[in-house]
Amino acid sequence: MGVGGLFQVALSRKQLRHDFKKILNHRRKLTISAIALAAYPLAFYSSMRLAGVAIGTVISIATAPFFAVLLECLFSKGKSITKKWLLSFSVGIAGIMLLVFSESSATHTVSNLRLIGILLGFMAGLFYAVYSWVAKTLIEQGVESQSALGCIFGFGSLILLPTLLVTGENLFASTTNILVVGYMALIPMGLGYIAYGFGLRFVTASSASLITLFEPVVAAALAVVVVGESIPLLGWSGIGLILICLLIQVKDS
């Protein structure tokens, strides 16, 4: 994500110069959002390591929409939880749980570490929600989406990249590793978040984070098509519920 942040800055440099004065008016929000963005992957991956991939994934992904709508209700004028959002959220969370736990196995993690992992999962969801809410707020106040994300990712990268000194020992050890890093930086972290920022121009942060529940569905589809894995019936049921969740979100939009 740190390398992807530099890519975001490079792509948005012209727009950043254009919106520089507007950005300066939101220094506090940008700082909070950059810290949240940098902390998100650290909390997310640590949660999966300590609590298990299934539990860490479910908590991190499922709590982000909840925290996002909570931030909107507390700090954004005229925003409230709608029945449509609540229904979509409930269906989506049920789908995520079925999909992820359909292939999970019993964990042998020490209980105290597992609790820490669960807590980190909640923190990851909160960090992602903070980033999304701040980005949406900046866009609503006249900052272009490309500038908002470029600035947030740029400052986030300055915080995140030094962690490579501790965690990135083998990151560039082989050609394969370098290609994977390049792909992750350019496609998911670069183009993916550009698309996410563009979407924030038209939907709320809570709706955008809810739509990202589609991410595990794509991962499951790639696992079947590319890797040749099989998904149990319970997992397919979860995918169906997630698709229903998305249909509820886009209905009448």
Regions found by a protein language model. Name each.
Residues 5-8, 81-103, 213, 222, ...:
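Hydrophobic transmembrane alpha-helices of multi-pass small-molecule transport proteins
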Residues 1-39, 65-71, 127-131, 149-167, ...:
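Transmembrane alpha-helices of multi-pass small-molecule transport proteins
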Residues 47, 74-77, 138, 148, ...:
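Hydrophobic/aromatic residues within transmembrane alpha-helices
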Residues 56-63, 134-157, 189-225:
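Helix-helix packing/entry segments at the starts of transmembrane helices
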Residues 4, 34-35, 39-43, 107-137:
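Glycine-/small-residue-enriched transmembrane alpha-helix faces in small-molecule transporters
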Residues 22-26, 101-127, 165-183, 230-240:
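Juxtamembrane helix-entry segments on the extracytoplasmic side of multipass membrane proteins
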Residues 1-10, 86-94, 115-123, 134-187:
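Hydrophobic alpha-helical transmembrane segments of multi-pass integral membrane proteins
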Residues 12-56, 60, 98, 185-203:
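Specific transmembrane alpha-helical segments of multi-pass solute transporters/efflux pumps
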